[in-house]
Amino acid sequence: MPALTQHSTSITLFRISAAMFLNYLTIGIPLVMLPLYVQQQLHLSDLLIGIAVGSQFIATLLTRGAAGRKADTSGGRRTVITGQFYCAASGLLMLVSLIAHPVPLLAWAILIVGRVLLGIGESFILTGNLTWGMWLAGSTHAGQVISWNGMATYGALAIGAPLGLSLYARAGLALPALLVVLLPIIASGVIYGIPGNIPTARPRVPVLRVVGLVWRPGTGLVLQGIGFATLSAFTALWFNERHWDNTGFAMTLFGIAFIAVRFFCAKFPDRYGGATVATFSLLVEGTGLAVMWAAPSAGAALIGAAITGCGCSLMFPSLGVEVVRRVPPEIRGTALGVWSAFQDLAYGFTGPIAGLLTPFIGYQQVFLLAAACALLGAAVVHLLLRQH
């Protein structure tokens, strides 16, 4: 770790978090806009739209381990720069797909390749940034590093989605695609001059061994992620079924509460311990989801969404502190990558599984199941992490 003062460390962490925000805008900008392009301009089916969206998630999930090994062997800074290259390349392929627009399936296939590159870039940037930040600040500030990165990523997703829609409405796909190309270049300028760590050569650690080290906090991440995935996938459908207004405000209030708690409580995991904060957070998340399930009106459901955001906010940094505490520094990047994949699993499989259940139990009961998972997660995290 470099010899940095507290002040210079904060400035450096702010710079790499700002770069993370710019990099994650490349993910937020196409988030809502791209499905509309595939539907309205390419006139393709919902199945192909779903593949276009899901291909990025699959690429991220499958490359978490590779990104972690890259961070452990080449350093966090180089891993981030590699991820930026992939993200910029995805924007170039979005532009190329415009040329193939007269042949919709060809244009779609080019977009899929771009989405895969974007998923790889996301994996490398997130894992590299966390590894790099912890090397700069020290493992005792792991919670703060993860919290600042989380604010950057969720802020970019919250801003990027409406920004992408606005740009698409004004100029079609070209302007959002061009911005996706330029943003990683701007982010590279933000991190220019920050020292990077060059790890010493280490033997490669089997992924299964790493899984054995991180499955306890990973289990908590899965049970927490079910709640967020349920809220993001089914709130609009449930509000529509109830004929409630202000559907979009659920995610807005969730995001505001999420970022506010991250901002004001970023040091809680380092101060009070990851296991304690994670257990309390899951209890709050479960309460919020239960409020949504029992809500008699849209207003009550929106309050539940905000409470859920408060509960979800510190889960990633608090469990991340536990991961850092349980693994040796030389495999920290791999461990963070493998552990993050647990969240990808929750986000990827909750929607399809819940979608199979909704014809039988309805949208409302899905929130009850999600609340039960969060409360179960509180008990599991308390037992597994406290006893280990």
Curated annotation (Swiss-Prot):
Entries under CDD domains matching the protein: MFS_YfcJ_like
Transmembrane feature ranges: 18-38, 42-62, 89-111, 116-136, 145-165, 171-191, 219-239, 248-268, 287-307, 341-361, 365-385
PROSITE patterns reported in the protein's UniProt record: MFS (PS50850)
Keywords: Cell inner membrane, Cell membrane, Membrane, Transmembrane, Transmembrane helix, Transport
GO MF annotation: an example: transmembrane transporter activity
Organism superkingdom: Bacteria
Compartments reported by the entry: Cell inner membrane
Primary location class: membrane
Gene3D superfamilies reported for this sequence: MFS general substrate transporter like domains
GO cellular component: plasma membrane
Bilayer disposition of the protein: Multi-pass membrane protein
NCBIfam families to which the protein is assigned, alphabetical: PRK05122.1, PRK12382.1
Alphabetized HAMAP family for the sequence: MFS_YfcJ
Family, similarity comment: Belongs to the major facilitator superfamily. YfcJ family.
Protein name: Uncharacterized MFS-type transporter STM4428
Species assigned in the record: Salmonella typhimurium (strain LT2 / SGSC1412 / ATCC 700720)
UniProt lineage: Bacteria, Pseudomonadati, Pseudomonadota, Gammaproteobacteria, Enterobacterales
